[in-house]
Amino acid sequence: MTNIRKTHPLAKIINNSLIDLPAPSNISAWWNFGSLLGVCLILQILTGLFLAMHYTSDTTTAFSSVTHICRDVHYGWIIRYMHANGASMFFICLFMHVGRGLYYGSYLFSETWNTGIILLFTVMATAFMGYVLPWGQMSFWGATVITNLLSAIPYIGADLVEWIWGGFSVDKATLTRFFAFHFIFPFIILALVMVHLLFLHETGSNNPSGIPSNSDKIPFHPYYTIKDIMGALLLILALATLVLFSPDLLGDPDNYTPANPLSTPPHIKPEWYFLFAYAILRSIPNKLGGVLALIFSILILAIIPLLHTSKQRGMMFRPLSQCLFWLLVADLLTLTWIGGQPVEYPFITIGQLASILYFMILLVLMPIAGIIENNLSKW
């Protein structure tokens, strides 16, 4: 009798995705981040569900309801901090996952890569809306500043902003709709993840060498299931350490003050994972230009496959490109630091230089390095 997991319509899908999936024999720990993102997503949906049971999306009670969760709900504090810090872990895994794709040339699977970019935008939108919900000072002013950026759109900008706000300022209507969207988006993300995996399984995984691995495949289970469980345990350990020892390490103290439309905080800044994009936005003195640079800083990923000049897929055997890649990582860390600094000398100049370098590396230097390396290899 044939095994049920190979015949049952539902079990067959799971089997072909997680058990009998042929996987390259040499994929490193950098390939763990996909499954870790799945763990993060499930964790966020579960903790978010329990938070939503006690949260109220009304401007008068939102802040108090979060306090109530932390003080009165059984283990409410750990659920709240797991959700808040889980978002940080989510973004750490996301950045590592995208970085892996850039380094090893995984972007040449264009459908998988493009669905990944859509996922990145959706996760960023979800995280932004979630940050508004506690209705602290930084929630309110962050929402005001970021939604206001849409007013830079010519002709329809001002109307668009009022339409999103549901009034003439960020108020009750805004909070309610942000809560509704924040609740539904993770399920949209879940559906997009299925599409992402569908496209990935059409081609199979890339591997560190960048050479097709069809001649050397191993079953996903038990080799990579055990490896993924190991990764998940390390992720949960890191998250637990963060939640139990320094839950407010990555947060903003301003968000412990209830939202007050009459008092602007001295430094408005988003969560740490948006700081690199925020720094790029701020480094351009023109409003529309800044907004375009902000969007393009993420959208640039979509044209990376078109800029691939090397005859090798990954950067494993390309020292010039490797240097540029790690320069890009250092540049992004610099931008993240600048995004959290006040708008004054020398931070403005550093931010502008780092922003120029970011676009230079991706649009100019990396394609040139690919051509140089081809010539060096006499190809």
Curated annotation (Swiss-Prot):
The yes or no answer to whether the keyword Hydrolase is present is: no
> What processes in GO biological process is this protein linked to?
mitochondrial electron transport, ubiquinol to cytochrome c
Instruction: State the CDD domains in the record.
Output: cytochrome_b_C (cd00290), Cytochrome_b_N (cd00284)
Q: Is Hydrolase among this UniProt entry's keywords?
A: no
Instruction: Give GO cellular component annotations, separated by semicolons.
Output: mitochondrial inner membrane; respiratory chain complex III
For heme b b562, which residues are the binding ones? H83, H182
Q: Which domain of life is it from?
A: Eukaryota
Q: Which UniProt keywords apply?
A: Electron transport, Heme, Iron, Membrane, Metal-binding, Mitochondrion, Mitochondrion inner membrane, Respiratory chain, Transmembrane, Transmembrane helix, Transport, Ubiquinone
- Family annotation (InterPro entries): Cyt_b/b6_C, Cyt_b/b6_C_sf, Cyt_b/b6_N, Cytb/b6-like_sf, Cytochrome_b, Cytochrome_b_C_euk/bac, Cytochrome_b_N_euk/bac, Di-haem_cyt_TM
Annotated binding of heme b b566, by residue: H97, H196
Q: Can you tell me which residues bind a ubiquinone?
A: H201
Q: Which residues cross the membrane?
A: 33-53, 77-98, 113-133, 178-198, 226-246, 288-308, 320-340, 347-367
Q: How is the cofactor bound?
A: Binds 2 heme b groups non-covalently.
* SUPFAM superfamilies the record matches: a domain/subunit of cytochrome bc1 complex (Ubiquinol-cytochrome c reductase), Transmembrane di-heme cytochromes
User: What molecular function does GO assign, one term?
Assistant: ubiquinol-cytochrome-c reductase activity
Lipid bilayer topology: Multi-pass membrane protein
Where found?
Answer: Mitochondrion inner membrane
CC cofactor: heme b
Q: What else is known?
A: Heme 1 (or BL or b562) is low-potential and absorbs at about 562 nm, and heme 2 (or BH or b566) is high-potential and absorbs at about 566 nm.
The annotated subunit structure for this chain is: The cytochrome bc1 complex contains 11 subunits: 3 respiratory subunits (MT-CYB, CYC1 and UQCRFS1), 2 core proteins (UQCRC1 and UQCRC2) and 6 low-molecular weight proteins (UQCRH/QCR6, UQCRB/QCR7, UQCRQ/QCR8, UQCR10/QCR9, UQCR11/QCR10 and a cleavage product of UQCRFS1). This cytochrome bc1 complex then forms a dimer.
Reported function: Component of the ubiquinol-cytochrome c reductase complex (complex III or cytochrome b-c1 complex) that is part of the mitochondrial respiratory chain. The b-c1 complex mediates electron transfer from ubiquinol to cytochrome c. Contributes to the generation of a proton gradient across the mitochondrial membrane that is then used for ATP synthesis.
Record's PANTHER family? CYTOCHROME B
* Name the record gives this protein: Cytochrome b
The lineage is: Eukaryota, Metazoa, Chordata, Craniata, Vertebrata
